[in-house]
C-alpha cells in the first residue's frame, strides 16, 4: 500500500509539473512580440530620389543605392546614419535600364523621429577636391574605415547597386531584365 501511495504521488507530481510547464510556455507565447525595428533605407532612398535626384535631368527612373556603414541613435529616437549613397537616373529602352546620369554622395544623414516614422533633417557630404579625404575622415569619424573599405570594394558596390536596381524593378513591376552603363556590357538582374 505504501509503494502504491508513493507511486501515485510521483505520478501526480509528474502530471502537475507537466501541466505547469505547459502553462508557462503558453504564457510565454502569449506575450506580445517586440516591435520590429523601422528600416531606414527606404526613408533615405526616398530622400535621395526627391532631393538629390532633382538636380539631374529628368529620366524614366531615379534609383538610389543605399549602403549603411553605421548608425547612432539618440535618446529622443533620432538617428544618425553614416553611409555610401548613389543616385542614378535611367532611361528605359526595351528590357534595359540605361544609366544616363548620376552621382556618388557618401555622407552622414540626420534622421528625425516623428512617432513611428522618420524624415531626413540634414545631409552632410565631404568637401570636393583636395579636401575630400580630410573632410570625409572628420565627417565619418569612427566609421571612416568601414566606409573606405566598402567604397573601395568594386564587387560589393556592384552587388549593392544591382540589388537596388532589381528591387526598384520589382517594386514598380517593370518589364526589365538588365541595366547598362554607357560603353559597358549590360548586367543581368537577378530574378528573385
Question: What feature does the model see in each segment?
Answer:
Residues 1-9:
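Bacterial N-terminal signal peptides that target proteins for export
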Residues 12-13:
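Repetitive helical segments and hydrophobic/amphipathic motifs
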Residues 18-22:
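C-terminal motif of bacterial Sec signal peptides marking the signal peptidase cleavage site
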Residues 24-26:
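Bacterial signal peptide processing site
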Residues 34-62:
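Short, non-transmembrane alpha-helical segments in secretory-pathway proteins
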Residues 65-130:
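Mature extracytoplasmic domains of secretory-pathway proteins
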Residues 121-192:
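Low-complexity, intrinsically disordered terminal/linker segments enriched in charged
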